[in-house]
A protein has these predicted regions:
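Solvent-exposed interaction surfaces and binding hotspots enriched for charged
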Residues: 1-87
Length: 87
């Protein structure tokens, strides 16, 4: 879960704002590749090249996927069901 204390978030805010600002200037066709590059580069820099750490990194990516779906996609889908009706 990405729930870190508010005080710990402050150290990331400025750099994240700058990164998001740069990504928002890209065309939709380029965002995915550049975001993939950024995340891959971060993971390669912080995790040593050992199976244990590769496994941890893949686990982090899986949890990011699940959290994004739970917090963003699922509420969106729920609203669309209300708007258009269920299948």
């Amino acid at each position: 879960m990405p729930y870190i204390k508010a005080g710990n978030r402050k150290k990331y805010e400025k750099i994240l704002e700058e990164l998001v600002k740069i990504l928002k200037t890209l065309s939709p066709e380029k965002i995915d590749g550049e975001l993939n590059y950024i995340v891959t580069k971060i993971l390669k820099e912080i995790y040593p090249l050992r199976y244990f750490h590769i496994n941890k990194a893949v686990g982090v990516l899986e949890c990011i996927k699940l959290e994004y779906y739970r917090r963003v996609a699922a509420p969106y889908e729920d609203q669309k069901i209300k708007d258009a009706g269920d299948v």
